[in-house]
Amino acid sequence: MSAITPYDWAIIAFVIGVTFLCVFMLTVPLLLGGKSWGRAKQEQFESGVVSAGGARIRLSAKFYLVAIFFVVFDLEALYLYAWSTSVREVGWLGYTTVVIFVVDLLIALVYAFSVGALSWAPADRRKLAGEKVKVGSPTMNIAEITRFNSIEELVTDPTGQIPAQSSGRVKSKTTPALSSEKE
């Protein structure tokens, strides 16, 4: 068995440090944290906002397209970086392979653009519908620009309200009429 080298000591110190840090981060909150229980303590929240509605919210497929585009172009960058580090060794065969790879990705990008996968803005949808798009006018109405185009875009909970309405923080359109009838 050989003697322990300085590199071995560095690895041992790193493992000990990581273990200590993990144990520290797991035990200190248990020791210093509060122990109170209650209904409000068990309620989930995100970024300081109490959640409203169910967790089964349908997301637009455009979010998945963003993720897929990221993966595709991230992998493209990875392959091109690997090729660029070995460009002298692979020669013309490697260059030809990379050109075919990039052309293939460009064809996929043109196809995605042609089917409308890259038109995400509400203005693009309005142009396709034949509406006149007002951008940057002094009388710009943000509510009109960001309105829902159809009920399919509006995710509702079982009560038929949007999640903010079911939490009671936003009044529905029928609420003021009901309150005026009671008076």
Curated annotation (Swiss-Prot):
Signal peptide: none annotated. The chain crosses the membrane at residues 11-31, 63-83, 98-118. This is NADH-quinone oxidoreductase subunit A. InterPro entries: NAD(P)H_OxRDtase_bac/plastid, NADH_UbQ/plastoQ_OxRdtase_su3, NDAH_ubi_oxred_su3_sf. It catalyses: a quinone + NADH + 5 H(+)(in) = a quinol + NAD(+) + 4 H(+)(out). Its EC number is 7.1.1.-. It holds the Pfam family Oxidored_q4. It is a multi-pass membrane protein. It is found in: Cell inner membrane.
